[in-house]
Amino acid sequence: MPRANEIKKGMVLNYNGKLLIVKNIDIQSPSARGAATLYKMRFSDVRTGLKVEERFKGDDIVDTVTLTRRFVDFSYVDGNEYVFMDKEDYTPYTFTKEQIEEELQFIPEGGMPDMQVLTWDGQLLALELPQTADLEIIETAPGIKGASASSRTKPATMSTGLVIQVPEYLTTGEKIRIHIEECRYMGRAD
């Protein structure tokens, strides 16, 4: 089993009976001599989706779990269920709307590239999205001429219903790139 100082973002731990995906790691080096380096880790509980924070010393032993990751494409909606199809063997993976409610805000009609399903021991656990999503602005206040890139922001509604803050110079109909984890504007889409 690896030590806490060997854990990387994206790994999955079995901790206190929960499966936790590592989302972020902050390393805190103490100023006192002989004190251990602390690793403050932010997790997402695979089963419930709740955010969890834990602290470990660098030499603490942790139990890692190997999940199976499969690339999928969005296939169709059947009532309250969303079906994703494996890109290699065409296995369907079905999620309820409640299971992937947060992820649906970033998935445009027709799907997006690089989506993955996480399975463990044959059990479907989660849908993992890439770091960014390209979405179209469907509603925002009119663009202001002469507004610079560093000026104020305004709310904009995306094609999926997501509302984020964007620079004032953007207008309805433009495609923008959004950082999914931080839910923030990154720039215009290519």
From Swiss-Prot:
One GO cellular component term, please give it. Answer: cytosol
* Cysteine-cysteine disulfides: none
Query: Known SUPFAM superfamilies for this protein?
Result: Nucleic acid-binding proteins, Translation proteins SH3-like domain
GO molecular function terms noted in the UniProt entry: translation elongation factor activity
Q: Which InterPro entries match?
A: Elong-fact-P_C (IPR015365), NA-bd_OB-fold (IPR012340), Rib_uL2_dom2 (IPR014722), Transl_elong_fac_P/YeiP (IPR020599), Transl_elong_KOW-like (IPR013185), Transl_elong_p-like_YeiP (IPR011897), Transl_elong_P/YeiP_cen (IPR001059), Transl_elong_P/YeiP_CS (IPR013852)
Q: Which family does it belong to?
A: Belongs to the elongation factor P family.
Q: By its UniProt entry, which PANTHER family does this protein fall under?
A: ELONGATION FACTOR P, TRANSLATION ELONGATION FACTOR KOW-LIKE DOMAIN-CONTAINING PROTEIN
Q: Under what name is this protein listed?
A: Elongation factor P-like protein
Q: Which organism is it from?
A: Klebsiella pneumoniae subsp. pneumoniae (strain ATCC 700721 / MGH 78578)
Lineage, highest ranks first: Bacteria, Pseudomonadati, Pseudomonadota, Gammaproteobacteria, Enterobacterales
